[in-house]
Amino acid sequence: MPDPMRSYLDFEKPVAELDSKIDELRALAASGSDISEEISSIEEKAAQALKDLYANLTPWQKTQVARHPQRPHFSDFVKGLITEFTPLAGDRKFGEDEALIGGFGRFRGESICVIGQEKGATTESRLKHNFGMARPEGYRKAVRLMDMADRFDIPVLSLVDSAGAYPGIGAEERGQAEAIARSTDACLSLGVANIAVIIGEGGSGGAIAIATANRVLMLEHAIYSVISPEAASSILWRDSSKAQEAATNMKITAQDLLRFGVIDAILKEPAGGAHRDPAAVIALTGDAIAGALNDLRNLDRDSLRQQRRQKFIDIGRKLG
């Protein structure tokens, strides 16, 4: 059987079958049979099949990969990249929102403010973090942290992974749209460097509220869009089953967005996606963040602010 801890997507069935065969042969080898050459041969086939498959993913398949339950989340990146991380809670107006986590720590020896959505990895944690869908108090907490970072001249890192801001009645009553707008404005107004990395789903205003940054990086199989493919197909065709078609037409992949100038760089994932080798992806992401911060190091506060604002004005003019 394939690794019981590994979750395969529907389109990965050929790879799952090869992995299953490898496990069967390994079980035979453990009983004394000398079949190492056969195992090696099938392992090579499985690796090549995975490489070929992921080299030609459709936008809808990338959407599935971006949502993979074993994909590294905000907390994994923080554990792998940030030392002495101290989370801060509450918006000082209503309460705490655990869908959006933020705090201060050290990145490669230097102080940094980190904010981002956490989806959770288990049923209990997903409920605790509301599947990464932040409420108004989450975005107001982000504004509070960005204000602190700006005051103490500490760069800001945003790790984006959310299907979107929470659309519940309570969230709307507490000013969800206003909170998103103020968070977006806080990003644009920072006098310190800020880097955003789309690590999974970058959904709508819930994503851009913390992603209007000097540099926007995106993992190879992440997605970034104004609306989910399912919702778009329901609106455009009154049929959610057309999500695959919507995903293609919406241009939500890193490759499309780099071509349009919406993002600045694509971070390579291993064959099979980030969930196949989280440690490697996290390390590569750390190097990219360090490089981006270094590029911005010599810019003064006004230049950082102007570069960021002009970046998004140019996107609007180009794509508007």
UniProtKB/Swiss-Prot annotation:
Principal subcellular localization: cytoplasm
GO cellular component, one term: acetyl-CoA carboxylase complex
Record domain CoA carboxyltransferase C-terminal: where: 41-295
GO biological processes: fatty acid biosynthetic process; malonyl-CoA biosynthetic process
SUPFAM superfamilies (UniProt xref): ClpP/crotonase
Keywords: ATP-binding, Cytoplasm, Fatty acid biosynthesis, Fatty acid metabolism, Lipid biosynthesis, Lipid metabolism, Nucleotide-binding, Transferase
Location(s) in or outside the cell: Cytoplasm
GO molecular function, one term: acetyl-CoA carboxylase activity
Enzyme class: transferase
Pfam families in the cross-refs: ACCA
Pathway: Lipid metabolism; malonyl-CoA biosynthesis; malonyl-CoA from acetyl-CoA: step 1/1
EC number, UniProt record: 2.1.3.15
Reactions performed catalytically: N(6)-carboxybiotinyl-L-lysyl-[protein] + acetyl-CoA = N(6)-biotinyl-L-lysyl-[protein] + malonyl-CoA
InterPro entries: Acetyl_CoA_COase_a_su, ClpP/crotonase-like_dom_sf, COA_CT_C
Database matches in HAMAP family: AcetylCoA_CT_alpha
Assembly: Acetyl-CoA carboxylase is a heterohexamer composed of biotin carboxyl carrier protein (AccB), biotin carboxylase (AccC) and two subunits each of ACCase subunit alpha (AccA) and ACCase subunit beta (AccD).
Family: Belongs to the AccA family.
NCBIfam families the record matches: accA, AccA_sub, PRK05724.1
PANTHER family, per database record: ACETYL-COENZYME A CARBOXYLASE CARBOXYL TRANSFERASE SUBUNIT ALPHA (PTHR42853), ACETYL-COENZYME A CARBOXYLASE CARBOXYL TRANSFERASE SUBUNIT ALPHA, CHLOROPLASTIC (PTHR42853:SF3)
Functional description taken from the UniProt entry: Component of the acetyl coenzyme A carboxylase (ACC) complex. First, biotin carboxylase catalyzes the carboxylation of biotin on its carrier protein (BCCP) and then the CO(2) group is transferred by the carboxyltransferase to acetyl-CoA to form malonyl-CoA.
Name under which the protein is recorded: Acetyl-coenzyme A carboxylase carboxyl transferase subunit alpha
Organism whose genome encodes this protein: Nitrobacter winogradskyi (strain ATCC 25391 / DSM 10237 / CIP 104748 / NCIMB 11846 / Nb-255)
The encoding gene: accA
